[in-house]
UniProtKB/Swiss-Prot annotation:
This is Uncharacterized protein in glnR 5'region. To B.cereus similar ORF in glnR 5'region. Signal peptide: none annotated. It holds the Pfam family Met_gamma_lyase. InterPro entries: Met_g_lyase_put (IPR009651). It comes from Bacillus cereus. It comes from the Bacteria.
Length: 80
């Protein structure tokens, strides 16, 4: 849901310090900083994403809830 480069498809790649290829994601410049919200995750089961930071609790909570809603709508995630 980030306005910056949200139309691009992310591709996993090697990054020093990681055992697996990773996708790095950062939705930036909403409140003026490049560290507002970022996440990364290894490309292997169980496909976990690690939220690296956020400037405000509300911003991070909205982003995580939006991501979960999108996964549920696309039937990529079920919550029982």
């Amino acid at each position: 849901a980030s306005p910056i480069n949200s139309h691009f498809t992310p591709y996993a790649n090697y990054m020093p310090g990681y055992e697996d290829d990773v996708i790095m994601a950062a939705g930036t410049f909403i409140q003026g900083a490049s560290i507002e919200l970022s996440a990364d995750g290894p490309i292997r089961p169980p496909y976990v994403a690690y939220v690296q930071g956020g400037l405000t609790y509300s911003h991070v909570k909205i982003a995580i809830c939006s991501a979960i809603d999108a996964l549920i709508e696309k039937e990529l995630l079920t919550i029982s």
